[in-house]
Swiss-Prot record:
GO terms for biological process: iron ion transmembrane transport; manganese ion transmembrane transport; manganese ion transport; zinc ion import across plasma membrane. Belongs to the NRAMP family. The gene is mntH. It is a multi-pass membrane protein. Keywords: Cell membrane, Ion transport, Iron, Membrane, Symport, Transmembrane, Transmembrane helix, Transport, Zinc. Disruption phenotype: Disruption impairs growth under conditions of limited iron avaibility, but does not affect virulence in mice. Induction: Up-regulated in response to iron and copper. The keyword RNA-binding does not apply. This is Divalent metal cation transporter MntH. It comes from Mycobacterium tuberculosis (strain ATCC 25618 / H37Rv). It is found in: Cell membrane.
Length: 428
């Protein structure tokens, strides 16, 4: 009897410990889930109107041929974004701050100038994308649509300023899900053939134009302002933990954060190309985003077309606010200036409204804005790999040697592809 009692006590004790372990696991998972968010804000840059233009053009012209480029670009981008967030967590500095600390004033001013031009080019693309969506949905003139996009993006930034980063992350994540629904809704009507999709994962090109579009996809995917921004987002959200278990845990959560966010962004980009390949191949009216909308309307119906336009609008609104946020972080980090967000919003909105008012082709302007962004890629990615591979900067959290080598390969490859994009665009 005593033996049975001891056995029962042992089982109860063991069950209690298992229950405590399960409770701790649930608490840990709940806490880890709460810590997700910064990467989802940065991921908005990967589903902006520039991506829509590049992916739709690729699918309409070459079908599934360049699907592998989207996959490769998103894998590269995931590594870059993780390194950016890691820098912010470990050093307590954003990438612009870490770079500016190592420069004299003239060099910092020059570096800020190129970064600011890139941020403004980003904003032009986002505002134009939102204006196109509003014209599609409500037949509004492009300048009016641009103003509305700018005002709404300012309201989103006001949430971040007055209610904190966590609520801002939730709103942006919700918009990311709207974008995902908008560009994947067509798969409920018709799905691409699996063999064709698998064939698109085999790396290959088909003439010079496919190389240009591949470079455009890469240029629209790895965005310099997202690289600058993510380091600051991670620092502001998680602080600057001391070396030890807490830092290791936050870095682990950050890997999950980046992985999930980039999986969604990559899936949306792939969906854009697949929708175009499935429904727009061979049509002559898909050279513009509006043409793509009409093609979706004709082949899949009004409901799917409206969801496509809603996805585009959410893309323009969310990415415009994120772009302005990145610009403010760049200025603060390099020049230690803090400009009121309203003033900054008006300054960056000016070029976009001028382009829309003067009657330039909006889709062509979107493509050219990606070329301007291409100039900024090396200035963001190369210093990031160097800093995160430096023991003097990162201490015991320096990149593993293999990670650093892969980072250099990715940085050089992305930079060369963007140089190729610039050359091919300039030479026609």
């Amino acid at each position: 009897m005593a033996g049975e009692f001891r056995l029962l006590s042992h089982l109860c004790s063991r069950g209690s410990k298992v229950g405590e372990l399960a409770q701790d696991t649930r608490t840990s998972l709940k806490t880890s889930w709460y810590l997700l968010g910064p990467a989802f804000v940065a991921a908005i840059a990967y589903v902006d109107p520039g991506n829509v233009a590049a992916n739709v053009s690729s699918g309409a012209q070459f079908g599934y041929l360049l699907l592998w480029v989207i996959v490769a670009a998103n894998v590269m981008a995931a590594l870059v974004q993780y390194l950016s967030a890691k820098l912010g967590l470990v050093t307590g500095r954003s990438l612009p701050e870490a770079i500016g600390k190592r420069m004299g004033r003239p060099a910092r001013l020059a570096y800020w100038a190129q970064a600011e031009i890139v941020a403004m080019a980003t904003d032009v693309a986002e505002v134009i994308g939102g204006a196109i969506a509003l014209r599609i949905m409500f037949n509004l003139p492009l300048p009016i649509g641009g103003i509305i996009t700018g005002v709404v993006s300012l309201l989103l930034l006001t949430i971040q300023d007055r209610r904190g980063q966590r609520l801002f992350e939730r709103v942006i994540t919700a918009l990311l899900l709207v974008i995902a629904i908008g560009f994947t809704a067509s798969f409920f009507v018709v799905t691409p053939p699996p063999n064709a999709v698998l064939g698109g994962l085999a790396p290959r090109f088909q003439g010079t134009e496919s190389v240009l579009l591949a470079a455009a996809i890469m240029g629209a995917t790895v965005m310099p302002h997202a690289v600058y921004l993510h380091s600051g987002l991670a620092r502001d959200r998680h602080g600057h933990p001391d070396p030890g278990p807490q830092r290791r845990r936050l870095l682990r959560v950050t890997r999950w954060d980046v992985g999930l966010a980039m999986l969604i962004a990559g899936g949306v980009n792939a969906a854009m190309l697949l929708v175009a390949a499935l429904n727009m191949r061979g049509r002559g009216d898909t050279a513009s985003i509006e043409g793509a909308y009409h093609a979706v309307h004709d082949t899949l119906g009004a409901t799917i077309a409206v969801l496509f336009a809603v996805g585009l609008l959410a893309s323009g609104l969310a990415s415009s606010s994120v772009g302005a946020y990145a610009g403010a972080m760049i200025m603060q980090g390099l020049l230690h200036w803090s400009v009121p967000m309203l003033v900054r919003r008006l300054i960056t909105l000016g070029p976009a409204l001028a382009i829309l008012t003067l009657g330039f082709d909006p889709t062509r302007t979107l493509v050219l804005s990606q070329v301007v962004l291409s100039f900024g890629i090396p200035f963001a990615v190369l210093p990031l790999v160097k800093l995160t591979g430096s023991p003097a900067v990162m201490g015991g959290d320096t990149n593993h040697r293999a990670t650093t080598w892969v980072g250099w390969v990715v940085a050089v490859m992305v930079s060369l592809l963007n140089v190729m994009l610039i050359y091919l665009t300039v030479t026609g």
